[in-house]
Design a protein with these regions (language model features):
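Active-site-proximal cap/loop segments of hydrolase catalytic domains
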Residues: 1-147
């Protein structure tokens, strides 16, 4: 959404790793090599640093993060939030208390994701407070209970 703002109209980032410099070194170095600073001050990691291009946002963006995420810490998303605010961009932020990295299958997050796309892609208002329930006969139906 930041690199192709005229193409992407709606996006959702859940527990996003927005800058490999703020993540585990072994992951970043595996895919981008050792951090190198160029003579112009840019680095080989800049192309993966969303906060550097957040000002380009044009569409609707929902950022979601678990407050107890110990894989990709919430400050990774807050880097982008800070730059969106500086650029006076509208966006939506959902912080899920006491959730770790794997909240994406929780019924609430699934509903919020669906609602966001219905609202901003379909242009319709989703049913208010729709509750995803397990299928008859038990089971979770693929949805995780709240943590």
């Amino acid at each position: 959404m930041f690199h192709y703002p005229d193409f992407f109209k709606v996006g959702i980032s859940e527990a996003g790793n927005h800058d490999n410099r703020e993540y585990e070194d072994d992951w970043a170095e595996k895919w981008q090599g050792l951090l190198k600073t160029n003579s112009d001050g840019t680095t080989n990691y800049d192309n993966q640093a969303n906060q550097l291009v957040a000002k380009n946002l044009k569409g609707h963006l929902l950022l979601a993060h678990g407050t107890m995420d110990n894989n990709v810490p919430p400050y990774n998303t807050l880097l982008v939030v800070n730059e969106l605010i500086k650029a006076n961009k509208d966006f939506d932020l959902l912080l899920l208390p006491n959730r770790n990295h794997g909240f994406g299958n929780e019924a609430y997050m699934v509903r919020r994701r669906w609602d966001y796309f219905v609202r901003y892609l379909l242009g319709a208002e989703p049913p208010a407070g729709y509750e995803l329930k397990p299928p008859p006969g038990g089971g979770r139906g693929g949805f995780a209970p709240p943590q």
